[in-house]
């Protein structure tokens, strides 16, 4: 409904990149460039300065960007007001989650949400915590759920639920009969960890720092990109690891892994992260409220 040229310009201005804007809008870069040039011709002035493979807004571009921000806020407010009158809750939302959350928490949440709001389609993108925060910053997703602290103060971060991490070993490991372990007792073991940028790895690093240690002090033999891969490696007797307790319910029941409580314990927060827009799609507000309620009702699942 809003002017397509203005939508494209606004995205380029926000990201300061034609390439990133094309990816965000699912357009080709030449198509994005064409739309911006059309708007520049309409105003008979340049909106961007292009130098050394970088772009910046001209004075006119800054003016247009400011007005376009207000226009899209009003458009969103109008859309929500009309949908409130008709009672319609529909649309497409893009949600992002770090690997652990996407695999073990969101399937049930999104399944229940879809039953309540069948006309809302939720697309899920999976990355590590750093990747999800970056997607929120670039407006590539409407709502993110992460397992590590968010440093960007311009984003809204809401606590969802606590998560506990435990050490896992194979049933044949020398410590398998124990109930509790200190991380120092695992220092000589082959260690399997998540990749850089993972929320799990960041939390473990912070934990070790508090104990006067570092990930580099561990005998790391492998970095893997998902809890499933780590569990498989530990089950095969390749080493030990530290993972979220929510990821190992099945393996504990089957007896293929043994969980050891850490002393002192490691706890972290699963958090929602989103932009500070004053006005959002009604469907986004409903998803956020549904997710808050879901988190409260599942606080004691572990």
Model-derived segments and their meaning:
Residues 10-28:
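Short helix-boundary/capping micro-motifs
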Residues 39-40, 113:
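Conserved amphipathic alpha-helical core elements
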Residues 40-57:
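A short LG(V/I)-centered, amphipathic sequence patch enriched
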Residues 90-153:
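Central regulatory/effector-binding core of bacterial HTH transcription factors
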Residues 128-133, 137-141, 146-147, 209-257:
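Hydrophobic hinge/microswitch elements
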Residues 157-192, 196, 282:
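Flexible hinge/capping segments at coil-to-helix
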Residues 191-212, 281-282, 298-299:
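Secondary-structure junction motif
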Residues 258-301:
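A late-sequence structural motif
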């Amino acid at each position: 409904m809003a002017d397509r040229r203005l939508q494209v310009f606004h995205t380029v201005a926000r990201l300061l990149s034609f390439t990133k804007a094309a990816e965000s809008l699912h357009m080709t870069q030449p198509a994005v460039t064409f739309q911006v040039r059309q708007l520049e011709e309409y105003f008979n002035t340049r909106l961007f300065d292009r130098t050394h493979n970088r772009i910046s807004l001209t004075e006119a571009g800054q003016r247009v960007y400011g007005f376009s921000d207000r226009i899209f806020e009003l458009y969103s407010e109008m859309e929500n007001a009309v949908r409130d009158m008709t009672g319609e809750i529909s649309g497409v939302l893009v949600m992002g989650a770090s690997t652990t959350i996407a695999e073990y928490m969101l399937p049930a949440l999104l399944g229940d949400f879809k039953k309540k709001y069948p006309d809302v389609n939720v697309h899920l993108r999976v990355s590590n915590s750093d990747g999800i925060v970056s997607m929120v910053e670039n407006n590539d997703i409407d709502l993110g759920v992460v397992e590590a602290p968010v440093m960007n103060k311009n984003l809204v971060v809401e606590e969802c639920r606590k998560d506990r991490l435990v050490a896992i070993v194979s049933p044949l490991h020398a410590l398998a009969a124990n109930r509790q372990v200190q991380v120092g007792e695992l220092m000589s073991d082959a260690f399997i960890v998540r990749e850089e940028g993972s929320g799990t790895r960041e939390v473990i690093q912070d934990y070790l720092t508090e104990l006067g240690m570092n990930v580099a002090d561990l005998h790391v033999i492998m970095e893997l990109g998902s809890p499933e891969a780590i569990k498989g490696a530990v089950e095969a007797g390749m080493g030990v690891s530290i993972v979220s307790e929510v990821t190992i319910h099945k393996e504990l029941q089957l007896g293929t892994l043994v969980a050891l409580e850490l002393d002192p314990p490691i706890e972290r927060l699963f958090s929602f992260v989103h932009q500070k827009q004053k006005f959002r799609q009604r469907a986004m507000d409903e998803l956020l409220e549904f997710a808050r309620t879901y988190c409260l009702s599942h606080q004691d699942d572990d």
